[in-house]
Amino acid sequence: MATPAYMSITGKQSGLITAGAFTAESVGNTYQEGHEDEILIQAFEHEIVIPRDPQSGQPTGRSIHKPLVVTKVVDKASPLLLQALVNGEKITSAVIKWYRTSAEGKQEHYFTTTLEDALIVNIKGKMHHCQDDAMKHFTQLEEVYFSYRKISWDHVGANTVGSYDWRDEEGNS
């Protein structure tokens, strides 16, 4: 089983959109103490590419950041995320905390991805075929797509950082 990641999302008008999203009232018996104001990420996908000349392989422009996509269960935050999408609400910050198993066998936060001035650009609802026995352990899911002005990466364990801000001419902050 993959180790979890948790995300908190703050909107300019809505405030902490993920407040209470990972509680028993919101997700039933799958909640976990200590992460009440976050969503559990079921899957993650993000792609950054550099355009390049097909002949020489040399870069021809700045990096292209495709939407960052998280898959989550339908929870208390779902209506608020949909409202933020349809209103075009600015997401002031979206923070993903990544966990791994430590040498002591415990979950430890080791990596953080932070989006600033983000926007939810798409939400896809998903439900696996409920009569397929192979899918019976799945629940209702949604994929949330984020575009952003700035992204930062922080390896908390190794104390290394990186970032990209499209307002910065060089792309570094």
Residues of each region from the PLM?
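Glycine-rich, low-complexity intrinsically disordered segments
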Residues: 1-173
